[in-house]
From Swiss-Prot:
Residue numbers binding [4Fe-4S] cluster 2: 152, 156, 159
Protein name, per record: tRNA-2-methylthio-N(6)-dimethylallyladenosine synthase
InterPro entries linked to this entry: Elp3/MiaA/NifB-like_rSAM (IPR006638), Methylthiotransferase (IPR005839), Methylthiotransferase_CS (IPR020612), Methylthiotransferase_N (IPR013848), Methylthiotransferase_N_sf (IPR038135), MiaB_methiolase (IPR006463), rSAM (IPR007197), rSAM_horseshoe (IPR023404)
PANTHER family: CDK5 REGULATORY SUBUNIT-ASSOCIATED PROTEIN 1, MITOCHONDRIAL TRNA METHYLTHIOTRANSFERASE CDK5RAP1
Length: 436
């Protein structure tokens, strides 16, 4: 098989897409002989892996592929993969006829079958996940990303993911454990378990086996010798039961950083979003986790200006932010998406200037908290896993609760856990000195 064909991949969107891009790379390397290049002009095949959660990445898709078409060498092919591919399908080729094929987010393993078929569109979502093929490509030597499920069964009214990735199906636990074990044998010391709603894992399998739980999966994965740290994203607040929280708190291998997507602090807005929980439920779960895990970092997603959101609703969101004291917030202004239930609320959509101001107010509130909290870490000694060496001679790594830390060091520290005394901070990272 020829090995001189070159592949260029551009990834838009979430961490699931990053893993999907690794899967694409591995499939095409294994079955079609492609090698990856960072130079688009050298590529024989150009793929853009897309996101459709918000409007901006969709607009960016057509801008990007237009530029790719201008830059590509003669005879090079262009493919579109991911959530926008699932959503728009054939319309992508109609709008951009120079696109050679389209492969949906649930069809990555079929990339090898369509890459040579001009005009191919593969967007079905009825795959059997009991035969799921994990990616063998790795972008980080010391951290592995492993999908534990595909799709989503939630019906959040603002979200397009269920229609692009299909129903939620869990990958069999023995396959996940074996994949993590292989990754550890190849040098990984940390694993990131990925799914749209990881803590609803085990409710449905392709082979109709008995139900399982995410807590049990965490216990099974943590038994793997050589694995030092387990992370996961994203959990759903609705499924954060006491059993899960207690396992999270007591299991020393689980990273003490958790993503809890709030979306809104208003119970009435949460109901309109069909999130399934109330403001009080969210605060109760966050409080219980803070109580059991003193050094816990909590990150979140928040949407402002959802249709019908009043000023009182928005103040409820600010109240939750003040009570929980999130360590990182991914803030978004509501973006209407085609095919979502929230489109029926068009008459309740807020003026753009109101949404923009609320976004500013939220960002400013959180900024003030970080400016107060981060300097308190100066003088602390933190243990980090060193993952990379920067051109300026600094190593970069992460603490157990996923704080990014920089320190002077060498490649001898790569893949090792070291102690760093913090000497300086920003709102998002720390700097220090390696100590014995």
């Amino acid at each position: 098989m020829s090995s001189n064909k070159k592949l260029f991949i551009q990834t838009l969107g979430c961490q699931m897409n990053d893993t999907d891009s690794q899967h694409i790379q591995a499939e095409l390397e294994k079955h079609k002989g492609y090698v990856t290049t960072q130079n688009i002009e050298d590529a024989d095949l150009i793929i853009i892996n897309t996101c459709s959660v918000r409007e901006r990445p969709v607009q960016k898709l057509f801008s990007e592929i237009g530029q790719f078409n201008k830059k590509k060498k003669e005879g090079a092919k262009i493919g579109v993969c991911g959530c926008t591919a699932s959503h728009l399908g054939q319309d992508i080729i109609k709008r951009a006829p120079y696109v050679d094929f389209v492969v949906g987010a649930r069809n990555i393993s079929k990339i090898k079958d369509v890459v040579d078929v001009k005009g191919a569109v593969e967007v079905s979502i009825d795959n059997d996940e009991s035969t799921y093929e994990f990616s063998t490509a790795k972008t980080n030597k010391y951290r592995a990303s492993v999908n534990i499920s595909v799709g989503c069964d939630k019906k959040c009214t603002y979200c397009i993911v269920p229609s692009t990735r299909g129903e939620e199906i869990s990958i069999p636990p023995e396959m996940i454990v074996e994949q993590v074990r292989k990754s550890v044998e190849q040098g990984a010391v940390e694993v990131m378990l990925l799914g749209q709603n990881v803590n609803s894992y085990g409710r449905k399998f392709s082979d109709k086996r008995e139900k399982y739980t995410f807590t049990k999966l965490l216990q099974d994965v943590s038994k793997i010798d050589g694995l030092e740290r387990i992370r996961f994203t994203s959990p759903h607040p609705l499924h954060m039961d006491d059993e899960f929280i207690e396992e999270f708190a007591k299991n020393p291998k689980i990273s003490k950083c958790i993503h809890m997507p709030l979306q809104s602090g208003s119970t009435s807005v949460l109901k309109a979003m069909k999130r399934g929980y109330s403001k009080e439920w969210f605060l109760n779960r966050a409080s219980k986790m803070r109580e059991l895990v003193p050094n816990l970092r909590i990150t979140t997603d928040i949407i402002v200006a959802f249709p019908g959101e009043t000023q009182e609703d928005f103040l409820d969101t600010l109240d939750v932010v003040e009570q929980v004291k999130f360590d990182q917030i991914f803030n978004f202004k509501y973006s209407p998406r085609p095919g979502t239930e929230a489109l029926n609320l068009k008459d309740k959509e807020l003026p753009d200037e109101i949404g923009s101001q609320r976004l500013i107010d939220l960002i400013e509130l959180h900024k003030r908290y970080l400016e107060e909290s981060m300097p308190k870490l100066i003088g602390e000694t933190l243990n980090i896993l060193v993952e990379s060496l920067k051109p300026n001679g600094e190593v970069c790594g992460y603490t157990d609760n996923y704080l990014q830390v920089f320190a002077k060091g060498s490649d001898e520290l790569l893949g090792k856990f070291v102690n760093v005394k913090i000497t300086d901070v920003t709102r998002t990272s720390l700097k220090g000195e390696v100590v014995n």
